Amino acid sequence: MEEIKLYGVKIDNVTREEAVCRALRATGEPCVAFTPNALMLERARKDTALATLLNRASLSLPDGAGVVWAAEKMGMPLRERVAGIGFGSEILERAERSGLRVFLLGGGDGVAEHARENLRKKHPRLCICGATWGYFQKTGEENASVISYIRACRPDVLFVCMGFPVQERWVIENLHLLSDIRVIACLGGSLDVWAGDLRRAPHWMSRMGMEWLWRMLRQPKRFAKLPEIASFLWHVPPKAEFTEKSPL
């Protein structure tokens, strides 16, 4: 499968349909899906350990207009933006039709449970076999208890929504204990949307790649991240300069 690299982080050049099919057809070890956006890539640019972490994914989806813009500027156009929540929603639809079992992990107190209730209303035949919050100790007995609960529920699909880089690090550190799961996807704030605590951007804004603006307007604390996003966009070299130098 074709891929590009931005600041040392691989990005799969896939459509959402291709990403979903690849994830659900995984055999052997789990398909681990990460969704790098501009903020994540900027932090990976400054911290090679984060770049290494992101590269542990078996599927790396270009989540965000900034990533698509950067790839275009560098002469490596991506076929489309694959938003994490869109990828997750499509997985849920396929899971309902195929009888796959889904586990929801993340969010604050009650968020995963509310998301499960809402998703069951939208997908009556969907089997959400378990749900629990993400604010637990990531080591020791509490972590072991959460993993035991997940394993006991026997999910085919695990959505981990605890924010970057906590969710990615937790998945990689515990992957050997989750080897029976077919798809493990890190989806950030998707549970908050499915729970009804956060509205998704209107379709026209999503189509124009302006979901980032919508999230900032709904959550003003996100404005503090603007300098990092601006830094990412500033450091992207134009195509000519990129061609003359070694790949990022």
What do these predicted regions represent?
Residues 103, 107, 111-119, 126-153, ...:
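Internal alpha/beta domain cores that form substrate/cofactor-binding pockets in large enzymes
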Residues 51, 92, 144-148:
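Short hydrophobic/charged patches on amphipathic alpha-helices used for structural packing
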Residues 1-86:
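N-terminal nucleotide/polyanion-binding subdomain common to many enzyme families
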Residues 33-35, 61, 157-161, 185:
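Structural motif
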Residues 68-105, 109-110:
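Hydrophobic alpha-helical segments and helix pairs
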Residues 56-67, 108-121:
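Short, compositionally biased "basic patch" segments
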Residues 66-71, 200-248:
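A transmembrane-helix-recognition feature enriched in membrane-embedded lipid enzymes
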